[in-house]
Structures are given as structure tokens and as C-alpha cells.
Curated annotation (Swiss-Prot):
Organism of this sequence: Geobacter sulfurreducens (strain ATCC 51573 / DSM 12127 / PCA)
Name of the encoding gene: plsY
Subcellular location: Cell inner membrane
EC number in record: 2.3.1.275
Assembly information from the UniProt record: Probably interacts with PlsX.
Name of this protein: Glycerol-3-phosphate acyltransferase
Lineage of the species this protein comes from: Bacteria, Pseudomonadati, Thermodesulfobacteriota, Desulfuromonadia, Geobacterales
Amino acid sequence: MLNELILTAVAYIVGSIPTGLLLARASGVDIRATGSGNIGATNVYRTLGRTVGIATLLGDCLKGLVPVLVARKLGFADPWVAAVGLAAFLGHVYTIFLGFKGGKGVATALGVFLGVSPLSVLGALALFIGIVATTRYISLGSIIAAAAMPLFVAAVERRPLLVGMTLVIAVIVIVKHRENIRRLREGTENRFKA
């Protein structure tokens, strides 16, 4: 049990690394003071361009994926795999390095989900791409894909603890998008420009 506790704590710390903030700072920008003020990949992309935005997306995704893969490699049971994945995600959303104020968690959740159920991610990703291609709203695609993810995991994995973890993550992602939801309702949400 000691190994499981250690990896869960490490996953939270790894998840807490503010990838977007660090990459933006390396470019001479405080990402919290530009655009939406969010440290996630979408704001970094809009502010600093494709290269830094994609690097942020990949870094945030890896923060969720790597701890889950390590937990699986070490043979952790589902409760601990779920704990490690949730810890990495919570680290990103409530980072210790920024006073427990982090990103919205979409990319880190993607990494966790890739480690838990890659086939489920394909369904959610197809949904995300379809919505963004149709509406040009990344936030709407993220919200709907997050809401659908527990259903995909339930259908593919049929493992209650992993479904439960996915549901908790999905709810937090949606709650973190409450301002986006308000702007979508008001018609003031920014559309994605390739």
C-alpha cells in the first residue's frame, strides 16, 4: 500500500506542474494576464500560437497519462489506478504551485482517460472533433465530450471504480467551464480559429 500512496502523491505533484504557465513564461508572457487568463492549452494557443499551444496540450496530457500508465505497469488494482488518475487531474485543476488555482483539466483528463480506456477516448474524441468542426467552440466540444466520457467508459470497461473516477472528473471539467457555459448562452463565447 505504501507504493500506491507514494504514486498517488507523486501524481498530484506532477499534475500540479503548470505546463502552460511555464511555456508561456519561457516566451516572456504571463499567460494568467492575457486572453482568458487560463493556463490551459486553448488560451496558450490563442495567445502564443500553434507551437506553444500544442506543446502545452501534450504536456498537460502527459501529466495525466504517465502516472496512470505507471500505476498499471506496477499492477495496481482499480481503486489505486482511479486514485492515481484522479490525483493527477486534481493536481492540474487545483495546483499547489498557484494557490490551488489551475486549468480546466481537459488535456490532463484526456491523458488520464487514455491510460484508463483508450477505446473510450476514441468515441469522446470523435464527438469533440465533430462538435468543434460544426460549431467552432472548443469549450462546447470539451463539455459534451466530458459529459459523454463516463458513458463510453461504462460501455467499454464495465468497471465501476473507473467509471466513478471518470464521472467525478467529468463533473469537475464541466463545473470549471461554467463561465464558458454562460458565454455560450449569451452568444459571446470565442470561436476557434485554425
